[in-house]
Amino acid sequence: MAIARGDFVRIKRPESYWYNEIGKVASIDKTGIKYNCTVRFDKCNYAGISGTAEGATTNMFAESELEKA
């Protein structure tokens, strides 16, 4: 089955901060870019954005790096 917007997925990219974590697909880009799936998570990563203490809660992944949860 193909991954669709709104699906909950497990991250399978070993070097990712969110490896083996579950997130929700926010969007899928169909233009042919490599990392076409935007995935949203409940927790923040370690990198602050624009001088704030909070980190990112989204990241881009290829469909091959995701599996349905």
Swiss-Prot record:
It comes from Prochlorococcus marinus (strain MIT 9215). It comes from the Bacteria. NCBIfam families: PRK02749.1. This is Photosystem I reaction center subunit IV. Keywords: Membrane, Photosynthesis, Photosystem I, Thylakoid. Pfam families: PSI_PsaE (PF02427). It is a peripheral membrane protein. GO terms for biological process: photosynthesis. Stabilizes the interaction between PsaC and the PSI core, assists the docking of the ferredoxin to PSI and interacts with ferredoxin-NADP oxidoreductase. PANTHER family: PHOTOSYSTEM I REACTION CENTER SUBUNIT IV A, CHLOROPLASTIC-RELATED, PHOTOSYSTEM I SUBUNIT IV. InterPro entries: Elect_transpt_acc-like_dom_sf (IPR008990), PSI_PsaE (IPR003375). SUPFAM superfamilies: Electron transport accessory proteins. The keyword Membrane applies. The gene is psaE.
